[in-house]
């Protein structure tokens, strides 16, 4: 596991809402081509965060591409941005088959494998481990929860820019 302090960040203060909107443009096309829906729910107001935009774009890309990969025709991936007290909150929700319970405890460890019925991809490789390291290097937290309607919810909390 990489120490979060070992990551060299190039911080910039940006509006998370605007950036996420930009970063999701290519995924809108991918979702449309695979018959999936990508729904965005974000406030009209700015949510300022200090992030390494290149590394954080990778975090979003990993979470959204994982969600699209496990989906099927007609499934929906939701990206929700909110502000809760001193944190920016980014949630990526899917209605895919979900994570097998035996994998949940090791989800953010490198090379956790899991075969899930109906998924196009059954391997959890380095992606979530690297995602966690990047989020933690930004002073943030990433959490996983089961989506009550089926699927997964990944929540990233980031401190608001001072």
Residue ranges with predicted function:
Residues 4-9, 48-51:
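Conserved micro-motifs of the catalytic ATP-binding
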Residues 30-40:
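Short conserved segments within the C-terminal catalytic ATPase subdomain
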Residues 94:
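Acidic ATP/Mg2+-coordinating residue in the GHKL
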Residues 99-111:
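Short conserved segment of the HATPase_c
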Residues 112-122:
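Glycine-rich ATP-lid/hinge loop adjacent to the conserved G-boxes
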Residues 127, 131:
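Short alpha-helical Gxxx[C/S/T] motif in the catalytic ATP-binding
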């Amino acid at each position: 596991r990489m120490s979060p302090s070992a990551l060299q960040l190039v911080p910039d203060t940006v509006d998370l809402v605007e950036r996420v909107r930009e970063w999701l443009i290519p995924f809108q096309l991918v979702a449309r081509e695979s018959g999936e829906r990508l729904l965005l729910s974000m406030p009209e107001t700015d949510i300022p965060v200090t992030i390494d935009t290149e590394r954080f774009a990778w975090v979003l890309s990993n979470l959204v591409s994982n969600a699209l990969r496990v989906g099927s025709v007609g499934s929906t991936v939701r990206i929700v941005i909110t502000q809760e007290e001193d944190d920016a909150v980014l949630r990526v929700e899917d209605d895919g088959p979900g994570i097998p319970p035996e994998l949940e405890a090791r989800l953010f460890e490198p090379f956790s494998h899991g075969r899930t019925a109906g998924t196009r991809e059954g391997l959890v490789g380095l992606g979530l481990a690297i995602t966690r390291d990047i989020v933690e290097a930004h002073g943030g937290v990433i959490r996983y929860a089961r989506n009550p309607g089926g699927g997964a919810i990944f929540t990233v909390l980031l401190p608001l820019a001072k």
